[in-house]
Amino acid sequence: MTQFHRWPLALAMAGTLLSVGCSSEQPTEADPSPEGSASPDSSTASETDSRVLGAGTQALAAGTYEVDLGEERLPNIEITVPDGWTSDDGWVVRNGVVNTPHWVAVQFWDVDEVYAHPCHWRDGLIQPGPTVADLATALADQPLRDATEPVDIVVDGFEGVQMELSVPADMPARRYELGDDVYADFLGCDRDEVVGDRAFKSWTGVPGSWGGSERYQQGPGQVDRLWILDLDGERLVIDATYLPSTDAQDRGDLWQVMESIRFET
């Protein structure tokens, strides 16, 4: 089951208030390099010969994999993960199950519009414009996100910015479970009539693109470290995200996975 799909609340068991804390981590300038990145022997990275992440949920052995976003305008992406990580539909790689202690994730997004207010998202959407700076400005202006100042970065030869967004740690939310997955119902936010819960939403994906149709957040205190990159005129957002329950080891693994990213040009 894709970790970023929200199931109707009526199908799940509502109940426990989410317990949260604050993150004090600050973004640092990104200078990705092979040193320090997870780099196991590729011969042990998968039980199959395929290195391309595909549809569905795929358990991953340690190694380097290929992300094909299905867009000729974008290069394929190499990403190296530790043992025990999982791929969801080829555009999300994660460790653990959302809202459990070891959960972290990296997502790839083709962002279209930004919600004017992430909690009261029925107020409308903003079309930020096509550039890296346009999107960074729109996200920095979004209420309740405590956005950091965008920092210039270069990732495998491509320029962009890094910034962090967060969800207020004291935002009331109730968790509900379905199978192995745990979701957040943000009590003060607008209700999603399709899903049935109250959502905290950041942006929408370009219609018809890979991946998710909208970026909703998984819980109070969640942090998203964003790389907004210009790939020869095409914008790509890479979102490394974690929750307050994530420990330092798992956050360290998350940053190593991000720093392993290379583009096949």
What residues fall within each predicted segment?
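N-terminal targeting sequences that direct proteins away from the cytosol to non-cytosolic compartments
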Residues: T2-C119, S209-S213, Q218-P220, D230-T265
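Conserved polar/disulfide-associated segments of primarily extracytoplasmic proteins
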Residues: V52-L53, G90-L231, V237
